[in-house]
Amino acid sequence: MSLDTAIFAGGCFWCMVQPFDTYPGIEKVESGYTGGHVANPTYEQVCSGTTGHTEAVKITFDPDKISYKDLVEIYWHQTDPTDASGQFQDRGDNYRPVIFVKNDEQRKIAEKSKKALQESGRFGDAKIVTTIEDVQPFYPAEDYHQGFYKKDPQRFALEEAGGRQQFIEKYWKNN
């Protein structure tokens, strides 16, 4: 079994773990920070907006069971790709939506998927602003952030209630 990785940023990383964690072929979903200029940042540093990092998830998967293309589709269903300034109640550059790609194959898949989403008209005239960027070093978040939806389901539910679930239902309910 040869495993691969994918990195996605879509707002609060707490809300990005559970949607991927439930699929066959997903070996691990890790919360962390990427895209910035500070090595080994802390949560507090990232939240301060001074590191350039965004909260993200690193997904380790078996491409024989789930494809990178499938992961990109799951990603779109978890984010507001028309909002470059954060996601839902989480605002700021550290919550920006990004698909981090590690090679030309991932880039082609992500760009094709983004173009198809734009052309679908699902979001009306709104532009799909999620960026596709080269992968940067990924720094795992502190242990208390890992698998947060399992550790603190009540607090996780409050985070999910901040507009994400309503958005998903509005735009993806029948899909």
From Swiss-Prot:
Keyword field: Oxidoreductase
EC number(s) stated in the UniProt entry for this protein: 1.8.4.11
Top-level taxon: Bacteria
GO biological process, one term: protein modification process
Recorded GO MF terms: L-methionine:thioredoxin-disulfide S-oxidoreductase activity; peptide-methionine (S)-S-oxide reductase activity
Catalytic reaction equation(s): L-methionyl-[protein] + [thioredoxin]-disulfide + H2O = L-methionyl-(S)-S-oxide-[protein] + [thioredoxin]-dithiol; [thioredoxin]-disulfide + L-methionine + H2O = L-methionine (S)-S-oxide + [thioredoxin]-dithiol
Active site: C12
Enzyme class: oxidoreductase
Pfam family, one: PMSR
Coiled coil ranges: none
Role this protein plays: Has an important function as a repair enzyme for proteins that have been inactivated by oxidation. Catalyzes the reversible oxidation-reduction of methionine sulfoxide in proteins to methionine.
NCBIfam families in UniProt: msrA (TIGR00401)
Annotated family: Belongs to the MsrA Met sulfoxide reductase family.
Protein name as annotated: Peptide methionine sulfoxide reductase MsrA
Gene expressing this chain: msrA
